[in-house]
């Protein structure tokens, strides 16, 4: 599997549903104590850490947008990759952070921003810098190699290691950032968010597990 997500996934969704977590649709801005009470319903031991990691008590909107993106995409992608690996299959994960160049750009590396790079259509949409063109060519090579062989790596390309629980390929053309394999820069955030996912999966499993039989057999009429 080759899949991933973008740095600012939440910017397209948060304005219509201003919640940092899909598990708690009524989460409201507040101080640390109020937010801890709310978030503890979904993240019993991680609420305070999440507030600090995302600065929810001081910047609910920006922190909430980032948390929403990490929760909907990042934590689930990593969980699926780990399940895939347990079955003996390889996973290649990416984190795309290139912010499309535009003076009026306020959405960051928004949901689906990487797709024009993969299909070579970026220039007709917003134009490309030389760095964008290089990133697009790199990504197209990775995707074509994976489609052909199940492995994105190839001659002359930066190595993309399979995901082993930590490795992500950071795809970017932003100033001050480099494309390459690394431990995910949001690992601490995804680690904390994972508690909410595991709580829900445990509840779902319990709901689907048949109740144990009492062993009693009804007498025939």
Q: What is the meaning of each model-derived region?
A:
Residues 1-131:
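Substrate-gating cap/lid region and adjacent catalytic-acid/histidine neighborhood
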Residues 74-221:
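Mobile gating loops/cap/lid regions near enzyme active sites that modulate substrate access
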